[in-house]
């Protein structure tokens, strides 16, 4: 079942999903409640644009995926900010529909174009986004010296 994020109710469950889904990601997987509150205070944050997907087959709903969108006020561009799928349900075809839910939200709010950033070695995400109609617009490379 899909629904929108509810401020004051969903923070902890979403943080747990995000940490699990992005366990190997240096920034996204380490988001704290304070980090989440900072983003909620941004002008672009809209709880309706943070789509949650719950598994309702058990005794109580369990958050299994989310699609957080971003749209700056006054901009006609939307962003796929973060798509998270719990590892226990990865490979079951959730990423595509979850991505589509967020894209639909952005379209309904008037976004004329949608962008996203993805790690170049994340083949699963790249396949999902290509199937959704995204094309590579730019490639960034980050180098570091030890």
Where are these regions (language model features)?
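A short beta-loop-alpha structural element at the N-terminal edge
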Residues: 1-16
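A conserved beta-strand-loop-helix scaffold within acyl/acetyltransferase catalytic domains
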Residues: 25-84
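Helical hairpin unit composed of two closely spaced alpha helices linked by a short loop
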Residues: 81-85, 103, 112
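A short, internal acetyl-CoA/4′-phosphopantetheine-binding micro-motif in the GNAT/acyltransferase core
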Residues: 83-90, 119
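A conserved short alpha-helix in the GNAT/GCN5 acetyltransferase fold that borders
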Residues: 90, 99-107
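Conserved active-site alpha-helix within GNAT-family acetyltransferase domains
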Residues: 91-92, 96, 120-138, 146
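Conserved GNAT acetyl-CoA-binding A-motif
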Residues: 106-117
């Amino acid at each position: 079942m899909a629904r929108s994020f509810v401020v004051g109710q969903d923070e902890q469950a979403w943080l747990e999903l995000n940490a699990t889904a992005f366990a190997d990601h240096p920034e996204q997987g380490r988001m704290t409640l304070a980090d989440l509150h900072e983003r909620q205070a941004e002008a672009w944050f809209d709880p309706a644009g943070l789509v949650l997907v719950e598994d309702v087959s058990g005794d109580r709903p369990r958050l299994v995926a989310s699609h957080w969108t971003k749209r700056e006020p006054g901009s006609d561009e939307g962003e796929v900010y973060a798509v998270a799928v719990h590892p226990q349900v990865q490979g079951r075809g959730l990423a595509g529909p979850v991505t589509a839910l967020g894209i639909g939200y952005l379209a309904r709010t008037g976004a004329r174009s949608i962008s996203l950033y993805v790690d170049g070695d994340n083949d699963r995400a790249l396949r999902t986004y290509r199937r959704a109609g995204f094309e590579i617009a730019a490639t960034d490379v980050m180098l570091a010296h030890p």
